[in-house]
Amino acid sequence: MDFGLSQDQRLLDESLRKFLTSEVPLDSVRKLAAGESSDASVWQGLASMGLAGVLIPEAYGGAQLGMLDAVAIAEALGYAACPGPFMSTAVMASYYLEQAGATDPLAAMAAGTYRVGIAFSDAIGTR
């Protein structure tokens, strides 16, 4: 059994890391931590690579990849300390909206023009 990434996943990872190295320098992360707003062009760049729609079906403009692909992307984004709505929009919201049959926003999410924020209350994890 092979638990490694496929050749396609390795190529995606390599392309993504090159993009992040050039587009998300550590200075931009420090500025964001200091309270400056994030650069929307980074999210649009990720969307143009198809990453905003990683789990969204092709019928809605997504890449229709799998959860392992999403994990590999999240790992690369985390390594670069890349801010953005990847987990909330491209993974959590797209997955649950599709499962619920609420497909109207998926095309805009895949295009990177619609971002979703996920909120958790204090009640989660408490008894």
Per-range role (PLM):
Residues 1-8:
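Intrinsic disorder at enzyme termini
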Residues 12-13, 73:
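A structural signal for short hydrophobic/aromatic patches embedded in well-ordered alpha helices
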Residues 21-127:
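Glycine-rich flavin
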